[in-house]
Curated annotation (Swiss-Prot):
Species of provenance: Dictyoglomus thermophilum (strain ATCC 35947 / DSM 3960 / H-6-12)
Family the UniProt entry places it in: Belongs to the class-II aminoacyl-tRNA synthetase family.
GO cellular component: cytosol
Protein's recorded name: Glycine--tRNA ligase beta subunit
GO biological process terms held by the UniProt record: arginyl-tRNA aminoacylation; glycyl-tRNA aminoacylation
Pfam families: DALR_1 (PF05746), tRNA_synt_2f (PF02092)
Subcellular location: Cytoplasm
Main subcellular localisation: cytoplasm
UniProt keyword Mitochondrion present: no
Domain of life: Bacteria
Reaction(s) catalysed by this chain's protein: tRNA(Gly) + glycine + ATP = glycyl-tRNA(Gly) + AMP + diphosphate
NCBIfam families: glyS
InterPro entries: DALR_anticod-bd, Gly-tRNA-synth_bsu, Gly-tRNA-synth_heterodimer
MF GO annotations: arginine-tRNA ligase activity; ATP binding; glycine-tRNA ligase activity
Length: 689
């Protein structure tokens, strides 16, 4: 029978975004550790607050399982003679503290040997737990690690106390100069009297009694209960991002929801400014009325009880008023001038130290946009809209509002463009080029915004690729993963017929690096893009489909997307298995570096190879142009594939491909190679499961 185990790591306040990754790591490590140590357990629970990381293991076994091991001893003919164990065998068992009854003889590849079957008793869990605690804390990786004082230990934030209990027994361990005990600490809003934890079983209740809700799910539900109660009692509608709830949950240990308000005059500001100020700057929950209009009310989550709540509300209202007053000033100052005026400031804003200013970037993007427009054959009106949009799309970076609220770039550009009287759809293009900002964000509704977004991201990535600023491990300070993710979604879902590699090469030319940076950096960049693309596609398609399609190239995302959609549907058809099997047979026989020649009909002697050649010509004439155009779905209704698959099988069953006659052999290999190349236009069939 096991006991419950408790480990509480008390720290200084941990940034909210550090906590979820730590929870996952602690859970995985704990399961793996005790599995490897062969100690049974019922469940592992990881709880967290801003100041505590907690492992709670239910019914952790009191000792390791006994392990049976076999030790090979001397050869049987030495240790066992005339039905008796020899002195050699006796010395062998004495060496391991065993008896002759534990010996047996087994046949091995090297002959018969004596083996000792020994049961190794498991260690007590109490002896193992100090190592578990130390190993666990050393294993956790945070987005940023820190060292404090003169201790040689790295963690997300300084460790201040450790509680470690197995049942009611203290586990003695010292980490980063902190010795474990059974005493936790109260929240900061209470007198700092240590909290005694008598045993692991009583932990949650003792913490609740001291105004600490350790379980993040319980805490989140408490927040939801309270904010919904306030909203319902006042006939308001809650409207907030999911990330806000997650962040607030990791900012408090004992949540209390309070209703505050601000001056109605600030409702004249753009709604997005109010929401960003409340959600991002202050972590408040905005409230709407029954008609969906934003109100001048908000909910703040206090870390503590409702004692002195009026003072707390007034303090939060005062802080919000100051922020909104600043925003009002920025807005009024910004709107004194048309948006175009702020383009003058772009030459003073650095894009990247070695890649120039934002103005330099705009000029590069302008050339790239013209190139894309030419490739796509845009109309003169569409070209004019794009030209004007390029002029203005970074202008809001020169405004006061975006200087204070960088996350509003593009969004304020759209608002200011409308106020400045820019004609539709220019404000829309300016405001939407930023999307998607994350992998699950929305896409632009206007394809011209997609073009601008593609050009902007291509320019950024080309510069970073040239400078070799690739992410290392989990670190990605420039945000290459985010930028490339947005680019890939635009290319995959916009269906614009563009070649990604060619755009990178063109962008590289526009930068005019000269001999400073090699063009080969684009190859390295495409490798990085390929890995990002594969990860993105694996969320939607099976691994064999993704690898089969990517193997034939991913320069043209529109083709890749069509190939993926085609094979996903084709897999459901009866002809799929036959064609895959036939083509795989063909793939296996072709030498890797074989270069096909033109097939000579005069050398086709067998009726089976003649028929296969006719099949090849038929497919080439009837649907190959469709395949080249990316119309792969024509194959879904192409009934000839069944007959073609049968003819490949008949060819292999009746024709000697590797003929002793060299001309005949090369001719047959050339026919097979041409068939492979024809279907290679779609995917690598050998990778399909």
């Amino acid at each position: 029978m096991g006991k419950n185990f408790l480990l509480e790591i008390g720290t200084e306040e941990m940034p909210a975004h550090f906590i979820d990754p730590a929870i996952r790591q602690m859970y995985d490590f704990s399961l793996e550790y005790f599995k490897n140590k062969k100690i049974s357990l019922e469940s592992v629970k990881i709880w967290a607050t801003p100041r505590r990381l907690v492992v709670y293991i239910e019914n952790l076994g009191e000792k390791q399982e006994a392990q049976e091991e076999e030790i090979r001893g001397p050869a049987a003919h030495i240790g066992y003679k005339d039905g008796m164990w020899t002195e050699v065998a006796k010395r062998f068992v004495e060496q391991y503290g065993a008896s002759l009854e534990d010996l047996h003889i087994e046949e091995t590849p090297k002959g018969k040997y004596i083996f000792l079957r020994k049961v190794k008793e498991g260690m007590n869990t109490l002896e193992i737990l100090p190592d578990y605690i130390t190993s666990l804390l050393k294993s956790i990786r945070f987005p940023k690690m820190m060292k404090w004082g003169d201790v040689d230990f790295y963690f997300g934030r300084p460790i201040r106390w450790i509680v470690a209990l197995y049942g009611d027994t203290e586990i003695e361990v010292e980490i980063a100069g902190v010795k474990s005990s059974r005493y936790s600490r109260p929240p900061r809003f209470l007198p700092q009297i240590p909290i005694e934890i008598r045993d692991a079983d009583s932990y949650l209740n003792v913490m609740r009694e001291n105004y600490i809700i350790v379980d993040q799910e319980e805490r989140k539900n408490e927040i939801l209960k309270q904010i919904n109660k306030i909203a319902n009692e006042n006939s308001f509608i809650l409207d907030y991002e999911d990330d806000l709830l997650k962040e607030v949950n990791y900012l408090v240990e004992y949540p209390t929801a309070l209703l505050g308000e601000f001056d109605k005059k600030y409702l004249a500001l753009p709604e997005v400014v109010l929401i960003i100020t409340m959600e991002k700057k202050q972590r408040y929950f905005p409230l709407r009325d029954a008609d969906g209009n934003l109100t001048n009310k908000f909910i703040v989550i206090r870390n503590g009880t409702d004692n002195y709540k009026d003072i707390v509300i007034q303090g939060n209202e005062k802080v919000l008023k100051a922020r909104l007053s600043d925003a009002e000033y920025y807005y009024h100052e910004d709107t004194k001038h048309p948006l175009e005026k702020y383009t003058e400031k772009l030459s003073g804003i650095i894009f990247q130290e070695q890649l120039g200013t934002i103005k330099d970037k705009v000029e590069r993007v302008r050339i790239l946009v013209r190139e894309i427009a030419n490739i796509l054959g845009l109309s003169s009106e569409e070209n004019k809209i794009l030209e004007r949009s390029v002029n203005l799309y970074k202008a809001d970076l020169g405004t006061l509002m975006v200087s204070e609220y960088p996350e509003l770039h593009g969004i304020m550009g759209r608002i200011y463009a409308k106020i400045s009287g820019e004609k539709d759809p220019i404000p829309e293009v300016i405001g939407e080029y930023i999307y998607p900002r994350t992998l699950d964000d929305r896409l632009p509704s206007n394809f011209l915004a997609s073009i601008l977004g593609i050009a902007d991201r291509i320019d950024s990535l080309t510069g970073y690729f040239a400078l070799d600023l690739f992410p290392t491990g989990s670190e990605d300070p420039i945000g290459l993963r985010r930028i490339s993710g947005g680019l890939l979604r635009l290319l995959l879902e916009s269906s614009l017929k563009l070649n990604l590699r060619n755009l990178f090469v063109k962008s590289f030319e526009i930068y005019n690096f000269g001999e400073k940076y090699p063009l080969s950096q684009i190859d390295k960049g495409m490798g990085f893009i390929g890995q990002r693309l594969r990860n993105l596609l694996l969320d939607r398609y099976s691994i064999d489909i993704v690898d089969a399609v990517m193997e034939v190239g991913y320069d043209e995302m529109w083709r890749l997307k069509r190939r993926l959609d085609f094979i996903s549907k084709f897999k459901e058809k009866e002809s799929y298995e036959k064609l895959k099997k036939a083509l795989n047979r063909l793939y296996r026989i072709l030498p890797k570096d074989f270069t096909p020649k033109e097939v000579s009909e005069n050398l086709l002697s067998s009726p089976f190879e003649k028929k296969l050649y006719e099949d090849y010509l038929k497919i080439k004439n009837e649907i190959f142009n469709d395949i080249l155009e990316g119309n792969y779905e024509v194959l879904l209704s192409y009934d000839f594939l069944n007959e073609f698959s049968d003819d490949i099988e008949k060819f292999f069953d009746n024709v000697l491909v590797m003929s002793p006659n060299e001309d005949e052999r090369i001719n047959r290999l050339s026919l097979l190679s041409l068939i492979k190349l024809l279907f290679w236009e779609i995917l690598d069939w050998s990778r399909l499961s």
